[in-house]
């Protein structure tokens, strides 16, 4: 079963990312700061991306960083971050993914595995390499410290995530476990989304 990153726990806790305003803030800030992620969201959701205001939010964050802030940019940042931490539009879907995991946990009557992508999952180049972790969101730096999440969320390309899933289907290393895989996505160049032609 493939779920969402919100099903993963914050390191050192038993708090799911979906239930953490701190996670949502770090998630949307990381998304907006990446040109590749903004493009990926627009490709994946088409006109629905307009509801996200991701490009306007990206611009407002850039204005603040570059010392050219305006009251309008501040309003965009504050309203977007308030919506992200109080009532993110994606929360119902991610909560549903977490609920589906709960049907599997503790069930030994069938052979199952449940994989969640890391937070910064997007289209990108294929490297063929990845790392794995069970139950927790992968972070840069101290994996056991979830105090500050901003700038620490790891990711993976859609290609490498597919390789990790295929490898698990063959190797079965994560039987009856919830796991994730992450890889190299340091380039910030947009790649064609596999969702465009769906």
State the predicted function of each range.
Residues 1-2:
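Generic beta-sheet signal
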Residues 5-198:
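Oxidoreductase cofactor-interface core, primarily capturing Rossmann-like NAD(P)-dependent enzymes
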């Amino acid at each position: 079963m493939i779920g969402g990153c919100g099903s993963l726990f914050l390191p050192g806790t038993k708090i799911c990312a979906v239930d953490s305003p701190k996670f949502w803030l770090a998630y949307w800030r990381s998304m907006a700061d990446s040109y590749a992620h903004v493009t990926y969201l627009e490709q994946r959701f088409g006109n629905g991306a307009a509801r996200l205001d991701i490009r306007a939010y990206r611009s407002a964050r850039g204005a603040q960083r570059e010392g050219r802030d305006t009251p309008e940019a501040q309003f965009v940042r504050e309203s977007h971050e308030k919506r992200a931490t109080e009532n993110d539009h994606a929360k119902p879907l991610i909560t549903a993914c977490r609920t589906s995991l709960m049907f599997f946990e503790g069930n030994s009557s069938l052979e199952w595995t449940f994989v969640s992508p890391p937070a910064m999952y997007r289209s990108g180049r294929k490297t063929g390499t990845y790392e794995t972790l069970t139950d927790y969101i992968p972070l840069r730096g101290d994996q056991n410290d979830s105090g500050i999440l901003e700038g620490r969320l790891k990711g993976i390309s859609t290609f490498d995530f597919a390789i990790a899933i295929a490898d698990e289907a063959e190797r079965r290393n994560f039987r009856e476990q919830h796991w994730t895989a992450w890889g190299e996505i340091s380039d910030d160049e947009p790649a064609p989304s596999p969702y465009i032609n769906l």
